[in-house]
Amino acid sequence: MAERSELHTRNKHNGQYDFSLLTENYPPLRKFVLLNPLGIQTIDFFNPHAVKALNKALLISYYGIRYWDIPRNYLCPPIPGRADYVHYIADLIDPERVSNTANEENGDKPKRQCRCLDIGVGANCIYPIIGHVEYGWMFVGSDIDPVSIENARKIVTCNPVLAHKIDLRLQKDNRRIFDGIIAPDEYFDVTICNPPFHSSKKEAEEGTLRKLSSLKGEKVKKTKLNFGGNANELWCEGGELRFLLNMISESRKYRKNCGWFTSLVSKEKNLDKLYAKLKAVHVSEYKIIRMCQGTKNSRILAWRFLE
């Protein structure tokens, strides 16, 4: 699992992890490093303490983040995959209008900083960290969970590179997505989201068991949700499909407040219903951006209103 392929060309995490660099910058990672059957350094990705240590080492080594922590039972995301989403979203940004360091290398003269809204920022605050460090974007991160907001705020406060660049907002109505977060006179160049996959706690547990069984090559009978995330990070009523249908409906109201609306879509079977909803709200353009991280295939749904 130390190797990944076909990540975005600007992703710093292409190839194998450089454990010499990572352990030098974050020595506590050393005790988790082992050799796989091919003699390649890796960690046990089923050990949440090892994954957390790896994340800390990656954030220190590649993003200059000196403090990062998450509460117990909260989602510890794979950074290479999160970075891929950010880099593909950067390709959507119009270099004639906003600052984007990926385009500045080509001699473009940006006019202002990009503003990005992260729906469901989580306690880990990963997307704003990567987006700001890589591209200088300004972020607003929203979440329905007060603990997530406070933890993300602590990460921002403890890292000078992030100070005054990331604004955290609590969504007080868990039935809403943009309502109560976007002010009437506010504008975002893009919104991003990694929605809850499942429709119930039971479905989330079954999905985690299937994933672990597939990865380990053997049947796993028991698991704990705290390995893969807090309840609101993993499931919501109606699951991913209902969440995204609601997001598309609300996006029409905020068509003048946002350039691009985007979200990850975990289940490809949901796409046809999402396409139908996009047509029903009369979007001007929509597209699917496909990503590949090793053996995992994922996709971004992006849409916009041009009025």
Swiss-Prot record:
Principal subcellular localisation of the protein: cytoplasm
Cellular component per GO, a single term: cytoplasm
EC number: 2.1.1.181
Origin superkingdom: Bacteria
The name this protein goes by in its record: Ribosomal RNA large subunit methyltransferase F
One GO term of the biological process aspect: rRNA base methylation
Top-level EC class as recorded in UniProt: transferase
Signal peptide limits: none
Keyword rRNA processing: yes
Pfam families: Methyltransf_10
